Amino acid sequence: MAATQDYKPGDIPLEEQDDRRLFCKYHYKGVLIVVIPILLGPMFLGHPIMIYRFMYISLCLLLYYILNLMARGAVAFIYITFIPVLGIAGSKHVSISYYTDLIFLVYGSVMLGIMMDSSRLSERLAMRVIAFVGSSLKLLQIFLAISVIIMTALINPTIAAAIWMKVAQAVITEYDNAGVVKMNSEEKRYEVGSKPYPTRPVIGIYITCCYSATLAGCLSPFVNPNGVISSSFEGDLPIGKLLMIMAGPAILGIVVMIFWIQVLFLGLFGGSVKRDLAELDGNQNNFKATIAERKLALGPWTIYPILALILIIIACFLAATRKPIIYMGWDDLDNSIESGLSVPSIGMAILFFAIPANYYFCKYYVCRQPVKEGTANSLVSWKAVNNNTPWGEIFMLGAGFAAAFCSQASGLNAYVADSMKEHTGEGSGTFKFISGALYGTLLTMLSPATAVCRLSLPTLMKGGSTFSLPLATALHNQFLLPISTPSNTIIAGWGNIRPFQFMLAGSVIAIFMLIAIAGMTAIISFS
């Protein structure tokens, strides 16, 4: 943090270099920022005009984001400026689309995770995890996958990913301190003073948390987008039938995910990662002693982590019982007003700031001086929240919601639905089915599935069930970018994982899920 606070632009100049051939090494980002909009310029000649304008600005935003050409927080607001300028939608509606109910769920989940760190609850839970898995990264990955899957299926994927990501970070920190895993790479950072990039094994552990949450969400009758998809089809796709479609792909997807991440990030079949981990094997002998010392340093549980754990349990209970689809929840008591997940998550976050972390002040009320004097700080401070919230990634998630809104406002969804409706003749059913599966995967790559279901699915359903049903089930395929789902956003922000790394990790899983979901949809729905 000191490096971030002390650094000013110009303090650390670029390395001097006389070799003109290295121009691209130092300036390619600036060149691409200018070249990409120029190369995509011919799209303005396309028709319908508004659709091609939306596609143009979306491609520019996506390429800037994936190629890391500028700060993510700046890229996120491209829609706010250019969507009104291009005449697609007014600035008021675009701005509102950035701040949805799910964004505040993310804020609440982030504050919950930061409270875990402030109270050192994450460290205490990490010790319990280490006692079970030891120093094995592969066992840690499987343990985290199972834990996230259970919590997601019963509560919520975003909350589950946030909680277990903090535990995973605490475990990795202990591994790093013990010398059995190297946490941070030596790769040059995008900005001077910014967080270091994680090593490949660490990326694999972190990504396991969000991918497990996404896959478990496919199987749960308690969480969206399952509920929104089922209600959109008005009885033609009951929640039980939807879960039957998703059960096989999700279970097999978990196996594929664990295997692929172990191959790519944990050195299952050798490579540089396995060699790097082998070099640290010599520190295994001191691992148990180091962990034992850390347990002694933590000491017994105090009121601070106990309070944090109690509030987390209450938050999970409120989220799980809000609107669980298969039985009446507390939000169903008043059908005139919907209380989204932002209500319990932000409501509990307010308590994080209101409830004191210690009770020294109580003794003053009975005229007794406490043994250890001090102020009554809250469970989490705003400074900690401000410093540890991944603002740029959350703003990019807002851009994902805006993309779903703008695809509707530009007429893209209506155009696609009309095209599918008009496509008749021999083989049209197969074409529509494949197109629906591919288009659904594309939409959920750019926007969270729940937003697509609420904003785009009603229009796309006009293209017929042969198109809309595979599209709807394909919306569970949320692996390719941090903005694909809120759990991806949180893990990418806290773990400092870049978009291209998500695309690399999610490519095989996304292809498998595309084929598996489409296959099960065809077998169960059209047989």
Task: Please provide the spans of the model-predicted regions.
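Juxtamembrane and boundary regions of transmembrane helices in multi-pass small-molecule transporters
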Residues: 2-17, 22, 28-34, 38-42, ...
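Interhelical loop segments of eukaryotic multi-pass membrane proteins
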Residues: 52-56, 77-78, 91-96, 101, ...
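Hydrophobic alpha-helical transmembrane segments
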Residues: 31-32, 55, 77, 103, ...
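Membrane-embedded alpha-helical segments and adjacent helix-loop junctions characteristic
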Residues: 15-20, 73-196, 376-379, 386-464
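Hydrophobic mid-bilayer segments of alpha-helices in multi-pass membrane transport proteins
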Residues: 26-39, 50-88, 101-111, 163, ...
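Transmembrane helix-loop junctions in multi-pass membrane proteins
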Residues: 41-49, 87-92, 318-329, 358, ...
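Transmembrane alpha-helix interface/packing and boundary motifs in multi-pass membrane proteins
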Residues: 62-71, 147-157, 211-221, 353, ...
